[in-house]
């Protein structure tokens, strides 16, 4: 193959254009591949670590709110306020259940799935006890039942709440730690892929120079 400086001007321009186009195409393809890989991994990170952290956090807030509702229901002396709190409790409980169910689809490890199932098993008994306490303590006219409800709320429901809430924190921390690890890995992968793209450009340029001699 003739060198560029040995070709006629028309042929030289055509060959130079083709070489330049080849270099640009290789660089563009490499850049697209890098972007697709990084985009895919960040989407994965958001789905399984970023959004779940938000779902778990919001679920925990609603769980805490429902706990506060119960304490107020059995502790307040105004029946109208208690009736309003009963409605608020239902909203907070349903909101929690909805958020909590959304978390399940984002669990990817056996450990997090096991923790999630343990929490679910404990929640079944927790909600059952919670409903019993509310039923006993929601009427201000029944002082004896209210005292029993307050006793159960303090000595039975409170420890159950603390245990479940602690497990939720463990799940949240696990998600946070794994998300941080994935973020670090993505940053490293980004640097490697960018370096690879630059290397491709250098190699392509070297090839074009060789053809041009």
PLM feature spans:
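Heptad-repeat alpha-helical coiled-coil/4-helix-bundle sensor or tether segments in soluble regions
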Residues: 62, 66, 86-145, 160-163, ...
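Amphipathic alpha-helical segments and their boundaries
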Residues: 10-66, 79, 107-123, 181-186, ...
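Short, Lys/Arg-rich, polar N-terminal cytosolic tail immediately upstream
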Residues: 1-7
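Residue-level signal for alpha-helical transmembrane segments in multi-pass membrane proteins
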Residues: 26-34, 71, 203-210
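Juxtamembrane amphipathic/coiled-coil helical coupling segments that flank
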Residues: 34-49, 67-74, 129-194
């Amino acid at each position: 193959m003739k060198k560029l400086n040995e070709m006629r001007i028309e042929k030289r321009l055509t060959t130079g254009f083709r070489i330049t186009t080849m270099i640009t195409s290789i660089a563009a393809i490499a850049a697209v591949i890098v972007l697709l890989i990084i985009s895919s991994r960040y989407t994965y990170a958001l789905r399984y670590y970023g959004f779940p952290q938000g779902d778990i956090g919001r679920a925990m807030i609603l769980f805490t709110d429902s706990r506060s509702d119960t304490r107020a229901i059995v502790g307040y002396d105004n029946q109208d306020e208690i009736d309003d709190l009963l409605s608020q409790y239902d909203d907070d409980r349903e909101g929690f259940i909805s958020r909590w169910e959304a978390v399940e689809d984002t669990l990817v490890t056996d450990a997090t799935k096991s923790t999630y199932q343990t929490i679910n098993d404990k929640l079944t008994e927790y909600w059952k006890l919670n409903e019993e306490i509310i039923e006993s303590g929601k009427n201000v006219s029944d002082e004896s039942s209210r005292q029993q409800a307050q006793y159960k709320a303090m000595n039975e429901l409170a420890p159950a709440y603390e245990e479940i809430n602690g497990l939720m924190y463990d799940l949240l921390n696990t998600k946070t730690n794994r998300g941080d690890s994935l973020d670090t890995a993505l940053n490293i992968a980004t640097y490697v892929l960018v370096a690879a793209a630059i290397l491709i450009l250098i190699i392509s340029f070297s090839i074009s120079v060789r053809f041009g001699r």
